[in-house]
Amino acid sequence: MASMVHQLKVEDFDEFKSVFDSDPVGRKEAAKGHVMSRSVDDPNVVFTRVEFDSLEAAKAFRDRLVASGALDQVTVLTAPTVVELVENVTY
């Protein structure tokens, strides 16, 4: 499985979430789903993982996201990075 991960610092989480949910870059058409987490130390630091069927789909979406300018409204702490699942262990 392929995913795109990134870490952002937002000014207002509720406003960010509203824009994210409006899906301005077409995430729902390209991806299988996503997981979003917030830092307990700073709830305006957001971690997002978006899951895709393939590395190619993840890379294409990452490129579209970067080109869209959607990230210009936030502070990017970790740039959108395409990753491949290596191991998933449950304890």
Predicted regions and their residues:
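Short S/T/G/P-rich N-terminal loop/turn motif that feeds into the first structured element of a domain
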Residues: M1-Y91
